Structures are given as C-alpha cells and as structure tokens.
C-alpha cells in the first residue's frame, strides 16, 4: 500500500486530499475535502510539475506523458492527470472528494507523487467543448493547488 497527501491552498480555497493505492496496477482512491469553492463543478487535475514557486501557474500543464488529447476520467483517450470534476455544495462551499481512478498511479515512472494537484475555477468540459477543450477542458483559472507527498 502506498499513500500520498496533498494539502491544497489558494487565496480562499483550501483542503486536504489523500491518495491510496494497494499495489501497482490497482485503482487509486482519492478522498478528502476542499472548502471555499463556489457552488458547482470544478476541474480537478494532476499537473506535470511539482512546483508552486509561482503559485499554481508554475505547475505546468496537465500530466500528459503520452501526449494525447484531454478527456474525462472515463474517456478512452485522456491525459493521465485528467480526474474530471469535483462538486461543491452552494450553501457550504465544500466539495467532498471521493474518486476511484484506474489511470493515475502512485508507483513507477508515471507516479503522480511529487506532482501538483490543481483545483480549477470552472467546470471541466471533459474535452467535449471548443477552443482549449482538448488541452485544458476550459476549466479556467487555478484557484488552489498543492504538491503530492508520500506518507
């Protein structure tokens, strides 16, 4: 079993997310809470660099080692880092995160440990929209981020 923690911080958005994976090839479970979000859907992605020296901007693009188009978490073609959306309750401004993903890994050369988790301002269109959809999902500004650390 490998586990990682990510403490995400932004101007008003913050939270803690735990990643766990039983063994290489098994699903990764992602759970935690993000608070301070506006109500609705928000893009939730692993970005390529473990760098927050210039805020969330220095995290680079979505983690995409196979150089394919952006998609949703259940798409046949997607970036490794494409985790889709999290949903924030309009009244509490809290998103309870519970994701099971079969593409990301905490093992090997493609491990997401040491990379940056980014929470976006807007809904990820899962690669189904126009313009930047095939690279960013049109998810908008980066409102919080943090680097995954092994625990």
UniProtKB/Swiss-Prot annotation:
Q: Which residues cross the membrane?
A: none
The cysteines joined by S-S bonds are 56-145
Entry binding sites for Zn(2+): 62, 70, 79, 82
**GO MF term set:** copper ion binding; superoxide dismutase activity
Q: Which cofactor does it need?
A: Cu cation; Zn(2+)
| EC top class named in words | oxidoreductase
Comment on bound cofactor: Binds 1 copper ion per subunit. Binds 1 zinc ion per subunit.
Which residues are recorded as binding Cu cation? Answer: 45, 47, 62, 120
The subcellular localization recorded is:
Cytoplasm
User: What chemistry does it catalyse, as a reaction equation?
Assistant: 2 superoxide + 2 H(+) = H2O2 + O2
One GO BP on record is: response to UV
Q: Which UniProt keywords apply?
A: Antioxidant, Copper, Cytoplasm, Disulfide bond, Metal-binding, Oxidoreductase, Zinc
Matching entries from InterPro entries are given as: SOD-like_Cu/Zn_dom_sf, SOD_Cu/Zn_/chaperone, SOD_Cu/Zn_BS, SOD_Cu_Zn_dom
Q: What does this protein do?
A: Destroys radicals which are normally produced within the cells and which are toxic to biological systems. Protects spores from cellular damage caused by UV LIGHT.
Per the record, the similarity remark reads: Belongs to the Cu-Zn superoxide dismutase family.
Q: How does it assemble?
A: Homodimer.
The protein here is known as Superoxide dismutase [Cu-Zn] 4
Per the UniProt entry, what species is this protein from, by scientific name?
A: Dictyostelium discoideum (Social amoeba)
